[in-house]
């Protein structure tokens, strides 16, 4: 079956072109994406405040000065029983706050990404789609699989020195796309298949998104703290159980996290571009060959129209037709069982 030109073009893109396509997708679809994703960000802020304000207030009320205690420990000064109990309680509460915060954040952000992933992928592939129907179709029973793996297992694994979390993220983040594809029977396996070989690209995409938001947020907060930051007494009055004002706390946190809200669509747009290109390459399989271009000493030819056959035995005097590696395009004069340039096996071509 003839592959569409859009899929071939997507498969041909370099990583730099993929990133540029992601930014282009962000700019073209920002108006449609910002409303649903901003709503999810605000929901995240509200849930975080209602779930953790009491715990944060209690932790602050313990009056534990961590810096002072650490200084005592460094000076080999024995802590009193009261100080030790307060420190233990403070650390346990802090860990609990961090875990709950990460859990809520991962679940809400996962749902947010799922809600627009199908729309973005179809827009990128220039298929007919609209945000309302795509948003509705995102909420099916398979979404619980994504929430469990990305929204729950990911924050749980963060407490295991981050390594399992990185592995889960790099291997299965494409599940936010594959779970909602009608032609995919095993979305986890499909997500892993497409992500295979793209682990570092996925991590680089995440880090790039993090750096951009971090820089813009830092500039914004430096201005925010100068003009809009309330006094500590006023803010504590909002938090205090006796005078708590949830409305002011929510408004304050929305303003403080405004950059995260406004740039919420960026990561899913970058990820969509990477997913589409990776999926195109995997779907085309060994039929895919890049357009003629040089990469150092390797030249990638245009796609061949005839099948490639590797004879198992050839006499020395027999002329052998040259062919190109279907993986890297390297010109091979003598048939081999593997590519001398990239090392890929050719055994499957004779199966």
Question: Which residues fall in each region the model found?
Answer:
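Hydrophobic transmembrane alpha-helix segments characteristic of membrane transport
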Residues: 111-139
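Juxtamembrane transition segments at transmembrane-helix termini in multipass membrane proteins
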Residues: 2-4, 9, 63-71, 118, ...
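Alpha-helix initiation/capping motif
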Residues: 8-11, 165
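Hydrophobic alpha-helical transmembrane segments in multi-pass membrane proteins
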Residues: 35-56, 94-110, 145-169, 205-234, ...
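A conserved helix-loop-strand patch within extracytoplasmic ligand-binding domains
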Residues: 79-82, 86-95, 99, 135-153
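Interfacial aromatic "cap" segments that immediately flank transmembrane helices
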Residues: 11-43, 132-157, 170-217, 245-249
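Membrane-interface interhelical loops and short interface/amphipathic helices
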Residues: 56-91
């Amino acid at each position: 079956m003839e592959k569409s030109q859009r899929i071939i073009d997507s498969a041909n893109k370099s990583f730099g072109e993929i990133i540029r396509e992601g930014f282009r997708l962000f700019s073209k679809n920002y108006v449609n994406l910002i409303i649903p994703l901003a709503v999810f960000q605000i929901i995240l802020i509200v849930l975080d405040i209602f779930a953790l304000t009491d715990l944060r207030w209690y932790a602050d009320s313990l009056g534990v000065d961590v810096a002072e205690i650490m200084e005592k420990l460094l000076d080999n000064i024995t802590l009193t029983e009261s100080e030790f109990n307060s420190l233990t309680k403070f650390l346990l509460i802090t860990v609990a706050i961090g875990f709950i915060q990460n859990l809520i954040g991962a679940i809400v952000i996962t749902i947010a990404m799922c809600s627009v992933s199908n729309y973005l992928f179809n827009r990128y592939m220039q298929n007919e789609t609209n945000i309302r129907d795509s948003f509705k179709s995102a909420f099916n029973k398979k979404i619980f699989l994504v929430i469990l793996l990305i929204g729950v297992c990911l924050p749980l694994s963060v407490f295991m020195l981050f390594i399992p979390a990185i592995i889960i993220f790099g291997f299965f983040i494409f599940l936010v796309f594959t779970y909602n594809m009608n032609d995919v029977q095993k979305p986890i396996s499909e997500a892993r298949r497409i992500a295979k070989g793209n682990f570092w690209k996925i991590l680089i995409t995440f880090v790039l998104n993090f750096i951009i938001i971090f820089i813009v947020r830092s500039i914004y907060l430096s201005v925010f703290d100068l003009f809009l930051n309330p006094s500590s007494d006023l803010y504590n009055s909002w938090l205090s159980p006796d005078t708590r004002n949830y409305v002011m706390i929510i408004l304050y946190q929305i303003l403080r996290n405004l950059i995260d809200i406004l740039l919420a669509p960026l990561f899913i747009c970058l990820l969509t571009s990477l997913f589409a290109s990776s999926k195109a390459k995997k779907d085309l399989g060994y039929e895919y060959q890049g357009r003629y271009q040089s990469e150092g000493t390797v030249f990638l030819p245009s796609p061949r129209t005839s099948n490639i056959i590797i004879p198992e035995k050839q006499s020395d005097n027999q002329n052998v037709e040259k062919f190109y590696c279907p993986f890297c395009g390297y010109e091979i004069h003598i048939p081999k069982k593997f590519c001398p340039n990239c090392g890929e096996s050719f055994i499957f071509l004779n199966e």
